[in-house]
């Protein structure tokens, strides 16, 4: 069974909820990442000097990660696979020494952040939709890394 229109709609509507409180959701996202993988702090230039704070760079990067996952959902619905529009993403992830476990940490933080953003609208279906979309994005990035 492929990615469904309902899953795409769930990701789209919850992405809009995420963006409504971008500053706080961005801080939450990176706080969750650093709780699981403190060493990841050095992978993000905007986190090196301090922890997650309300900074334009942090917000822009969080919006990019969530936006790429949103785009992955649309691609999965349209063509059943994810291709990267930015060919440089693989190289950046190689340069930062991103490994498989890092993708799992980001996925967990992403899901918890979406859950916080949507509140009582959180459901297993919503979790699955975001999880599948993120897995598609992660697979495309890993492919570009090799």
From Swiss-Prot:
UniProt PTM comment: Nitrated in effective nodules and particularly in hypoxic conditions; this mechanism may play a protective role in the symbiosis by buffering toxic peroxynitrite NO(2)(-). Nitration level decrease during nodule senescence.
Classification via PANTHER family: LEGHEMOGLOBIN-RELATED (PTHR22924), NON-SYMBIOTIC HEMOGLOBIN 2 (PTHR22924:SF92)
UniProt tissue specificity: Specifically and strongly expressed in root nodules and at low levels in seedlings.
Role according to the record: Leghemoglobin that reversibly binds oxygen O(2) through a pentacoordinated heme iron. In root nodules, facilitates the diffusion of oxygen to the bacteroids while preventing the bacterial nitrogenase from being inactivated by buffering dioxygen, nitric oxide and carbon monoxide, and promoting the formation of reactive oxygen species (ROS, e.g. H(2)O(2)). This role is essential for symbiotic nitrogen fixation (SNF).
GO CC annotations, alphabetized: cytosol; host bacteroid-containing symbiosome; nucleus
Residues binding O2, per UniProt: 61
Gene Ontology MF terms: heme binding; metal ion binding; oxygen binding; oxygen carrier activity
Keywords attached to this entry: Cytoplasm, Heme, Iron, Metal-binding, Nitration, Nitrogen fixation, Nodulation, Nucleus, Oxygen transport, Phosphoprotein, Transport
Nitrated tyrosine: modified positions: 30, 134
InterPro entries given in the database record: Globin (IPR000971), Globin-like_sf (IPR009050), Globin/Proto (IPR012292), Leghaemoglobin-like (IPR001032), Leghaemoglobin_Fe_BS (IPR019824)
Subunit structure: Monomer.
Protein name in UniProt: Leghemoglobin 1
Record organism: Lotus japonicus (Lotus corniculatus var. japonicus)
Subcellular localization(s) per the UniProt record: Cytoplasm, Cytosol; Nucleus
Effect of deleting the gene: Normal growth and flowering under non-restrictive nutrient conditions, but classic symptoms of extreme nitrogen limitation under restrictive nutrient conditions, including severely stunted growth, increased root/shoot ratio and delayed flowering. Following inoculation with symbiotic rhizobia, accumulation of free oxygen at the expense of reactive oxygen species (ROS, e.g.
Record Pfam families: Globin (PF00042)
GO biological process annotation, one example: intracellular oxygen homeostasis
Globin domain boundaries: 2-146
């Amino acid at each position: 069974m492929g990615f469904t229109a309902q899953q795409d709609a769930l990701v789209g509507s919850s992405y809009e909820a995420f963006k409504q409180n971008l500053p706080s959701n961005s801080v939450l996202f990176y706080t969750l990442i650093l709780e699981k993988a403190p060493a990841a702090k050095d992978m993000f230039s905007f986190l090196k000097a301090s922890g997650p704070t309300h900074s334009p760079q942090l917000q822009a990067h969080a919006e990019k990660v969530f936006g790429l996952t949103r785009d992955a959902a649309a691609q999965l619905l349209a063509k059943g696979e994810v291709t990267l529009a930015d060919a440089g993403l693989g190289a950046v992830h190689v340069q930062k020494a991103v490994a498989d476990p890092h993708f799992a940490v980001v996925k967990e933080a992403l899901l918890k952040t979406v859950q916080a953003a949507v509140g009582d609208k959180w459901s297993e279906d919503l979790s699955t939709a975001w999880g599948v979309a993120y897995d598609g994005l992660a697979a495309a990035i890993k492919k570009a890394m090799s």
